[in-house]
Amino acid sequence: MKKVEYWVKIPFGPIHPGLEEPEKFIITLDGERIVNVDVKLGYNLRGVQWIGMRRNYVQIMYLAERMCGICSFSHNHTYVRAVEEMAGIEVPERAEYIRVIVGELERIHSHLLNLGVVGHDIGYDTVLHLTWLARERVMDVLEAVSGNRVNYSMVTIGGVRRDIGEKQKRLILDMIKYYREVLPQIEDVFLHDSTIEARLRDVAVVPKKLAIEMGAVGPTARGSGIKEDSRWSEQLGVYPDLGIKPVTPEDVTGEKARGDVYDRMAVRIGELWMSLDLLEHALDQMPEGKIKTFPKDNILVAKLKLLGDGEGIGRYEAPRGELVHYVRGQKGRDGPVRWKPREPTFPNLFTIAKALEGNELADLVVAIASIDPCLSCTDRVAIVKEGKKVVLTEKDLLKLSIEKTKEINPNVKGDPTPTGIGCSRGV
């Protein structure tokens, strides 16, 4: 008899307990086996680029920070580097060291958060409690250094806004000592626990070839054995003086990279140790001197407005992978004519979608979590050029909203009005 296969398509998201943020995946299944994953972006779009092109260079710094709450420093830092390249602005050496310190503090908190999320997603909440308890220490230090647990506003064009004094240095050194005592326990649980290994080994394997073809970045790429880290390859700032190098699974486990969820977690654990080393070296080597080139923001904006046409690209290794910001300026404008961020989740999301083919449906959540997706800074609009142009007013949007609501629920009554009064539900 001829074998007949029945494939089923099910939606995963956009609202689902297994997702940190709204996003939609259409899963094609053959029984419990995943045949295809179709990624549907757009549920978190906030029009950040559109807003940015209507702001000046300084205002965009605060906008860039709010693209992502976990790696707010990374976005601002990368944007600022793009503007500095465009304008030819030199950054004081002390400011470069402070940037390293804040960046590595952010990396520690981001990796600990993701380790806890993965533990929770496989039902191992002991790991969640261990990692998130440890994460509180670095959050306290970030608050002491910047004044905030999130959105630190430390970086500015041409330097940093705040210095790191002796009190903050002592807090960071105490934190490093604390983590050198705590991390061995977290590492032991993650790398040598049979339950975790059974759930993470050989799940959502990203072969090295696939990672290269799909443009994977960060721990997702390094977990497949690719030695790539933009802090290292770009010789970024003072990182070369601090002994930066890419971390691969072989450095942590001693085994050749397989490219599975386990290896991606191993890379993050290895990078926690690397961040502690970088912090120690940065605090030890940081020179005295000024922390920014321009004392006032209005002086900075005036200088940028006088520049001729130009463009700049900023690259930085955010916790999730390589982050890129592109800026193009125009003479006489106090803001860019084009600002384009490229987030690490964008290539990683499509990489993991391909890697999920052939896996069990039960592994979907932990596989997605293993790339540590940030969907709020990834979403964008696709502009389809059909030769038509339509401008929708607030009234038009209200009318479309009510029409859609009536399609979903015919019992809803109401009409669009200039005052924006919505619908009323019939009794």
Swiss-Prot record:
Domain of life, per lineage: Archaea
InterPro entries: ComplexI_49kDa-like, NADH_Q_OxRdtase_suD, Ni-dep_hyd_lsu, NiFe-Hase_large
GO cellular component: ferredoxin hydrogenase complex; plasma membrane
Uppermost EC category: oxidoreductase
Catalytic reaction annotation: H2 + 2 oxidized [2Fe-2S]-[ferredoxin] = 2 reduced [2Fe-2S]-[ferredoxin] + 2 H(+)
Record GO terms (molecular function): ferredoxin hydrogenase activity; NAD binding; nickel cation binding; oxidoreductase activity, acting on NAD(P)H; quinone binding
This protein's record includes keyword Electron transport: no
Any Pfam family hit: Complex1_49kDa
The keyword ATP-binding is annotated on this UniProt entry: no
Temperature dependence of activity: Optimum temperature is 90 degrees Celsius for membrane-bound enzyme but 80 degrees Celsius for the purified enzyme. Membrane-bound enzyme has a half-life of 2h at 100 degrees Celsius whereas the half-life of the purified enzyme is 30 minutes at 100 degrees Celsius.
Keywords: Cell membrane, Membrane, Metal-binding, Nickel, Oxidoreductase
Subcellular location per the Swiss-Prot or TrEMBL entry: Cell membrane
Noted pH dependence of activity: Optimum pH is 7.0. Active between pH 6.0-8.5.
A single BP term in Gene Ontology: proton motive force-driven ATP synthesis
Function noted in UniProt: Alpha subunit of a hydrogen-evolving hydrogenase that utilizes protons both as a substrate for hydrogen production and proton translocation. Acts by coupling the redox reaction via ferredoxin and iron-sulfur (Fe-S) clusters to proton translocation across the membrane thereby conserving the redox energy in a proton gradient.
Entry's family note: Belongs to the complex I 49 kDa subunit family.
Subunit structure: The membrane-bound hydrogenase complex is composed of MbhK and MbhL, and may also contain MbhJ.
Name of the protein in question: Membrane-bound hydrogenase subunit alpha
